[in-house]
């Protein structure tokens, strides 16, 4: 599901503290009273850093951000492990089956790499302020859309950032897609997702590599590997019971909120929340993707669809246990109870 270009995990920059390399891509910094965001208009308009001011970034990026800042944009391009946060179009099974610019990938119904026009192209800065940024991408002949991405701190809550993506159909015929947010973090982050039952969780992984997990009191969480040095690689697809997920790392609580959707609105091959986990013996050098799918829709020519996430980051100085983490979420953000979407 991921190529070796993505799996540059040992060299992924987990402890990045909002400092650019001389050969790095351009970075635009947005800042509120509490938090800092860094976005590059290169690489499709990608988030490179987010966290509390003066703290390590919660976003994982790869060495190619500095070593390959100007990738070629073409229908034959392969994936490059920039990581960060970006936006894909789902479902994955349709990435190359509805295009005419790469026959080999079309005929193979390829599910990798992601659309290079969305992932690699330079975007245009449409609006910019100290706490707000809007970027417009280019027309993609692969997915048939153009993306408009917006980032803005909430003036009423300086710990919260709203991210939105608008996809417009640029073709002269309908296209069927969903908007898919993908936020890369370290595999060492302690992540939680509310689920009503275990039946709302499915695993895609080889049995020997499948991540261990449990749901307790309506919340999904990964379990530590049962043996030292164990490697894990796989995807968890979930129908959440509430519109949030959260992670804890580096004395920060990172909460992603979104509009909860009924199962029927999400493409059946996907989950509204997906977690992709990949790590070897050094878990902190591994990768966790925190992913959210918006409803699957058919767009008429020229029609657009929009989806958004709200990111909140708070200082956390409690114990590194699930009980303490969940108590903090309930106390500080009222993320306590779960409900069924269907």
What is each PLM-predicted segment?
Residues 20-162, 166, 170-342:
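Surface-exposed acidic/polar loop and edge beta-strand patches at domain peripheries
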């Amino acid at each position: 599901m991921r190529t070796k270009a993505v799996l540059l995990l040992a060299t992924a920059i987990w402890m990045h503290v909002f400092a650019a390399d001389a050969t790095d891509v351009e970075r635009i910094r947005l800042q509120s009273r509490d938090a800092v965001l860094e976005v590059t208009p290169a690489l499709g308009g990608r988030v490179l850093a987010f966290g509390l001011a003066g703290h390590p970034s919660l976003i994982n990026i790869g060495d190619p951000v500095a070593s390959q800042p100007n990738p070629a944009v073409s229908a034959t391009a392969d994936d490059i492990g920039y990581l960060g946060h970006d936006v894909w179009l789902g479902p994955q099974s349709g990435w190359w089956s509805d295009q005419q610019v790469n026959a080999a990938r079309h005929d193979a119904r390829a599910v990798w790499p992601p659309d290079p026009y969305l992932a690699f192209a330079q975007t245009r800065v449409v609006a910019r302020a100290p706490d707000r940024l809007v970027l417009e991408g280019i027309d993609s002949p692969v997915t048939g859309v153009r993306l408009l991405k917006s980032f803005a701190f909430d003036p009423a809550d300086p710990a919260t950032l709203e991210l939105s993506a608008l996809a417009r159909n640029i073709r002269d015929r309908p296209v069927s897609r969903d908007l898919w947010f993908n936020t890369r973090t370290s595999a060492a982050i302690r992540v939680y997702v509310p689920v009503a039952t275990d039946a709302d969780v499915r695993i895609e992984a080889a049995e020997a590599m499948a991540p261990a997990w449990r749901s307790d009191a309506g919340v999904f969480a990964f379990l530590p590997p049962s043996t030292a040095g164990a490697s894990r690689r796989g995807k968890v697809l979930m129908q959440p019971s509430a519109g949030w997920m959260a992670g804890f790392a580096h004395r920060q609580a990172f909460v992603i909120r979104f509009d909860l959707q009924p199962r029927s609105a999400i493409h059946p091959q996907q989950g509204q929340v997906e977690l992709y986990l990949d790590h070897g013996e050094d878990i902190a050098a591994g990768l966790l993707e925190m992913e959210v799918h918006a409803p699957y829709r058919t767009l008429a020519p020229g029609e657009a669809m929009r989806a958004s996430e709200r990111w909140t980051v708070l200082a956390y100085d409690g114990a590194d246990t699930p009980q303490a983490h969940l108590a903090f979420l309930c106390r500080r953000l009222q993320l306590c109870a779960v409900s069924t979407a269907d």
